Curated annotation (Swiss-Prot):
Its cofactor is Mg(2+); Mn(2+). GO terms for molecular function: DNA binding; DNA ligase (NAD+) activity; metal ion binding. This is DNA ligase. It comes from Nitrosospira multiformis (strain ATCC 25196 / NCIMB 11849 / C 71). Its EC number is 6.5.1.2. It catalyses: NAD(+) + (deoxyribonucleotide)n-3'-hydroxyl + 5'-phospho-(deoxyribonucleotide)m = (deoxyribonucleotide)n+m + AMP + beta-nicotinamide D-nucleotide. The keyword Ligase applies.
Amino acid sequence: MSERLSEISRHMRELRDAIELHNIRYYELDTPTIPDADFDKLFRELEELEQRHPELITPDSPTQRVGIPPLKAFPQVVHRTPMLSLSNAFTEGEVEAFDRRVRQSLGIAQVEYAVEPKFDGLAISLCYENGMLVSGATRGDGYIGEDVTLNLKTIRSIPLGLRAGDGSAEVPAFLEVRGEVLMLKADFERLNRQQREKNEKTFINPRNAAAGSLRQLDPCITANRNLRFFAYGIGVCEGGNVPHDTHSHLLDYLSSLRFPVMRERRTVTGVAGLLEYHHEINGLREQLSYDIDGTVYKVNELEYQEKLGFVSRAPRFALAHKFPAQEATTELLGIDVQVGRTGALTPVARLKPVFVGGATVTNATLHNEDEIRRKDVMIGDRVTVRRAGDVIPEVVAVQKESRPSNAKPFVMPEHCPVCGSRTIRLPGETLTRCTGGLFCPAQRKQAILHFASRRAMNIHGLGDKLVDHLVDNAIIRTPADLYKLGLAALAALDRMGEKSAGNIINEIEKSKDTTLARFIYSLGIRNVGEATARDLARYFGGLDRLMDADVETLQQVSDVGPVVAQSIADFFGERHNREVVEQLRAAGIRWKEGAGTQTTDHAAGSAHPGAAAASSKIAGRSFVLTGTLPTMSREEAREKIEAMGGKVAGSVSKKTDYVVAGADAGSKYDKALELGVALLDEAELIRLLQASQADNSSTHVDPERMV
């Protein structure tokens, strides 16, 4: 043997060893370390070398068999006819060559093909005797598989007994049905979520989840994994009225026996029909409920299939046309941190460019710090990247055996990479967040939109597009800048005339008169909704007391627990946020101070923040609003009641003191009558508010415009 031939032989041996290793990881361990596309490259390289040097083919070469030996944990089953795999095509030219070979072999001008999506699942065989399921096996190496009958019987889409749906099909004495076991995408996501909650191993993709679930020694585990089965053909058949003309009629027959078959299947003519179908299914790929990795073409006439026959490991009459790889391996060059509109910090992998899913990918999401730790991702690793359709590319696995010695762990930054504010991660949350909500450039648009929203400062006309214009043109940076806007600057914007600009300026000016609860809510403090903002305003009565409160004091407020208290303390503990709050006050925003219930030191001469509410006829009373009031909106009525220390509930109960009813009052009005709860109309509510306001005047607190 020449030196060059020896080198080729050595390389082929390395390829065989590598393919066998990856086969074991893929089929036995269900923990693949390389994407399918990389495996296909290794296999095709070995095939090409064997075609050029047939004298170097060995009996144990992976090209000479279909899969791998079965697991020793399951009994072995010898297939009555081999379960061969299909030859693959990756380009349109290879599909054209396949069609040409078929036509030339058959001596005909055009061929009709049965076509269907290619499942990305686990091939199995089901054997029925006199209509009853007696055994089921995996493909294994194509000749010997694993007996997984008990596990297969837990899959509800597999018939345990055969009967024709329309009465026309005759059940054979023996029937071997071949198909694919798979897991739907939604079930895969649910399974991985459950695995993470139990701190157990997660699966890379639905195919591996299906394989791992089917090979469980305990059938109860398989039963809980919600696997599905689809039939795609018949192996052996004895008796019955099974069609003998076309493959498509065979599938119709299986469907009549109540086997699930692919709905997207059809017949096409010629190579143009094959390629058109392939493009169509590729476009539908992300809409399907299950994973597919290509399309399958089979000569439809069964007589032609028999004439074409088989090569050593695949039929000549069929072809699998693969889609562009959705997974690929590349080097992780670094991890950058992006800040979203809500302040969430997201680690993003910076990658050596790699072509995957039909596009060149340079960045991929790592989701959060916990995911990085769970996957043990380090800078410098070789990683598997997945890109499916419009889904954001993500790092799904690490090739730890290839980890370089200089690989570096990732640490989430303690300060926001955009604005420099402190970052926090609250207990029970997976996301780290920037605390500079009012100041951070990454959060500007969201912060301003929330500030101006109807239930916050209620600035009509300040919508998404206008805020985009104002921020993108650096006209405003924080909510406080809204109160510095001039008519000329606004009117100069696209599609914004002087009249529209004047209306918005008036709305901004009107918003200066508000309530403390609305103002607190407008700041966008994480975990502080409208109800919590009202509780905080009622308890502290003034903004300074709230801003200076520590976590322990904050937890004295009704329904404020440790997480919410920490959010509030962190927000006001950030210098940038306090600066914006002071700018807002300086702009003229005002509200009534003093309607709190916090106890203070009277001996030191400080005013009692709860004095106003304490003497109010409304304080502590429970109200329910129903129907349409003549002059007030329900939101306005709520604010006036709460400003005097009252509470507004959503439903009527025995604890309700008053039901305020307007026009078209519904079931709440009826419930009040049934329970004997006092009913008020708007005029009576206003008189009650005025009486409470008069009582409060003796406390020397100056409430602004109560009614």
